[in-house]
From Swiss-Prot:
Residues 346-366 have a biased composition (Acidic residues). Disulfide bonds: none annotated. The keyword tRNA-binding does not apply. This is Gag polyprotein.
Length: 740
């Protein structure tokens, strides 16, 4: 009987401690607390003898744990020992700070001390045969207090008891802590001062069998939760919640010692069926004190129970914990999906034995799986109409169309919504292509999801296969799975072919002669995104094609950067922003020598657009042109136009220039150059009459005066030239013209 009562008291104490820790949002298991206190009893055998748990006694327990840690090492102490010790110390410290709790605890402590007794080591006193016959077997009713218990000792002379008769009890002297350490350990805690109960030889304490039966029934009803309140309970001042208590405090029950129950003479004594396995020993104290003790303890329990408030179920989105509440079913516009099967569930430890039955019941009532909330809206026909118009005008893979689809996918579209959108907006061929791509990507996502345990029906949920083809079931998917569905739908949409463009390979995309380099790179990257995915537009293969498939002008401009490791293609676009700029840069780099590139330019220069205006006043000797090397991309027309004649001028024989452009007046020998032809010749005139009527005189053909000839040495001339010198012609007689 005693072991069953002790077991129930331990369970009640552990449950109260769990409730106290739950107020501070700390959840512990019952078996962990049991193992913790088992280790405490092993380390501190004096701890059960104290009879109560307060900050002073708990501090001594901490000192013992520290000594045990220093002597035996950390491997002999469980990991969670000091954690539980600190939590219980905080509970005791915070409760001692509240004046109301202190007042209530002081009143209850006075009641318990006044009706308790100190431990005794004296031998039990023998009793007479009549007393033995009238007594019942010793037993203890189950108590709700794990720290204080009073049991009536056995009257059997042949058997020793831990609790001797009250007649032999005396007040033990107060022992010091040093002397207490050498005393043998006691098994159950007891309280001091038993003078009020010490009445060994009085016959007034003996009860008749009828009163004893009523007393047993009343004491057995103490632990009954249906026991009504007593009418003569003393009133206590109202209790104010302490400052450290949160907004919701769970019910806290206070344990009381098992003492003597009232007799049948007490008015208002309740009657209830006896509990199994519970019996009371023969009372040895006054009836009035027993009744008053029970009234005071019941009042204390009632006052503390009235302070209990059930905590509201708080709902937290992230992080997901075991204490998260369920979402209310009356929430409108919300979907409460099933837990994500792609996440690793929490492994629950199996509890075995009677000590874990209560813990399993409490954990079964709490949600062990996280609850997700997300907003789901059905597709709007106006939005589908916009996407259909964009697909018809620009194509399914146009930037504007893809932007509309991406904005629509933020509404957590289900697989049924994606299939409906593809069937309504795309053409027949594009719809089939999208479905095949979506199923392929869904299988890839299901294979990449490597979790333990494997996801339940993961390959069936993403494509919306049976039994998840219903849209209502798909709306209950967790956000993680809906995100994978969104990614698969967008990726399959971007792989559709462009509008009006034949499907070609990536290597056949080349830059046109008049196409800008940026447009060529844009076409190349769009095709790479459609074929390989969004992450392959900046790959090394695409960069290689951007150089090899460019036109010759852009290749010459970006050739110095070919061997460099470029993270992006921005430097290539800077040097080839347009085809004309790239051609000019390539031509300039080919025609200029390295020495000319490094030659410093003058600070001031005169730019002459027409150098022919200076040739009359300052003729310049023109050197024959040198043979220039032919370049493949050099402008040959401009070079041929600037080249002069390869022979000297036939008119002046001084330089290499054309005769039509010669401006010299003297030839190489110093002789004046006579202009040939009638460039400056005027109209012919008629003859004039003079004194000689038979002669006609005509005006000379040249209006300009004949220049004075220099004096020439005819002898020298004749020697050098065998030709005879011509004389100056005078007037000439000619016949008159036939007509005027």
């Amino acid at each position: 009987m005693g072991q069953a009562s002790s077991h129930s008291e331990n369970d009640l104490f552990i449950s109260h401690l769990k409730e106290s820790l739950k107020v501070r949002r700390i959840r512990v298991r019952k078996k962990d607390l049991v193992s913790f206190f088992s280790f405490i009893f092993k380390t501190c055998p004096w701890f059960p003898q104290e009879g109560s748990i307060d900050s002073r006694v708990w501090g001594r327990v901490g000192d013992c744990l520290n000594d045990y840690y220093r002597v035996f090492g950390p491997e002999t102490i469980p990991i969670t020992t000091f954690n539980y010790y600190n939590l219980i110390r905080d509970v005791l410290t915070n409760q001692s700070d509240s004046p109301d709790i202190q007042r209530l605890c002081k009143e209850g402590h006075k009641i318990l001390i006044s009706h308790s007794r100190p431990p005794s080591r004296q031998a039990p006193v023998t009793i007479t045969t009549s007393e033995k016959a009238s007594s019942r077997p010793p037993s203890r009713a189950p108590s709700t207090c794990p720290s204080v218990a009073i049991d009536i000792g056995s009257h059997d002379t042949g058997q020793s008891s831990l609790y001797p008769n009250l007649a032999t009890l005396t007040d033990p002297p107060i022992q010091s802590p040093h002397s207490r350490a050498h005393t043998p350990p006691q098994h159950l805690p007891l309280l001091a001062n038993s003078k009020t109960l010490h009445n060994s030889g009085s016959q007034d304490d003996q009860l008749n069998p009828a009163d004893q039966a009523d007393l047993e029934e009343a004491a057995a009803q103490y632990n009954n939760p249906d026991w009504p309140q007593l009418t003569n309970t003393p009133a206590l001042p109202p209790f104010r919640p302490p400052s450290y208590v949160s907004t919701a405090v769970p019910p806290v029950a206070v344990a009381a010692p098992v003492l003597h129950a009232p007799t049948s003479g007490v008015p208002g004594s309740p009657t209830a069926p006896n509990l199994p396995g519970v019996a009371l020993a023969k009372p040895s104290g006054p009836i009035d004190e027993t009744v008053s003790l029970l009234d005071g303890v019941k009042t204390l329990v009632t006052k503390l129970s009235d302070l209990a408030l059930l905590p509201p179920a708080g709902v937290m989105a992230f992080p997901v914990t075991r204490s998260q509440g369920q979402v209310s079913s009356n929430t409108t516009g919300r979907a409460s999906p099933h837990p994500d099967t792609h996440t690793i569930p929490e492994e629950e430890e199996a509890d075995s034995g009677e000590s874990d039955s209560e813990d399993d019941e409490e954990e079964s009532s709490e949600p062990t799986e996280p609850t997700y909330t997300h907003s789901y809206k059905r597709l709007n026909l106006k939005t589908i109409e916009k996407i259909k118009t964009a697909v018809a005008n620009y194509g399914p893979t146009a930037p504007f169309t893809v932007a509309l689809v991406e904005s629509l996918s933020e509404r957590w579209l289900t697989p049924s919504d994606w299939f409906f959108l593809s069937r309504a907006a795309l053409s027949g061929g594009d719809n089939i292509l999208w479905k095949s791509e979506y199923e392929d990507i869904s299988k890839q996502f299901a294979e990449r999801t490597r979790v333990r345990p494997p996801p339940k029906d993961g390959p069936l949920k993403i494509p919306g296969a049976s039994p998840y083809q219903n849209n209502d079931k798909q709306a209950q998917f967790p956000p993680g799975l809906l995100t994978q569905i969104q990614s698969a739908g967008l990726k399959a949409w971007k792989r559709l072919p462009q509008k009006g463009a034949a499907t070609t390979s990536l290597a056949k995309i080349r830059q046109g002669p008049d196409e800008s380099y940026s447009d060529f790179v844009s076409r190349l990257q769009e095709t790479a995104d459609r074929l390989f995915g969004s992450g392959e537009s900046e790959s090394s293969f695409v960069k290689h094609l951007a150089y090899e498939n460019a036109n010759p002008a852009c290749q010459s401009a970006i050739r110095p950067f070919r061997q460099k490791e470029l993270s992006t293609m921005s430097p290539l676009l800077w040097y080839c922003s347009a085809h004309a700029v790239g051609l000019a840069i390539g031509a300039a780099l080919q025609n200029l020598a390295p020495a000319q590139l490094l030659e410093p330019r003058p600070a001031f220069a005169i730019i002459v657009t027409n150098p022919a205006i200076f040739q009359e006043t300052a003729p310049k000797k023109i050197q024959p042109p040198t043979q220039l090397p032919t370049q493949p991309n050099a402008p040959q027309a401009s070079l041929i136009k600037n080249l002069g004649p390869t022979t000297k001028c036939p008119r002046c024989k001084k330089g290499f220039h054309w005769a039509s452009e010669c401006r010299s007046r003297l030839d190489i020998n110093g002789q004046p150059i006579i202009k040939q032809g009638n460039l400056n010749r005027g109209q012919p005139q008629g003859p004039t009459t003079g004194m000689n009527s038979g002669a006609s005189q005509f005006t000379p053909q040249y209006r300009q005066p004949t220049p004075a000839l220099p004096v020439i040495n005819h002898a020298a001339t004749s020697q050098t030239s065998g030709e005879q010198q011509r004389a100056v012609q005078d007037w000439t007689s000619v016949p008159p013209p036939t007509q005027y």
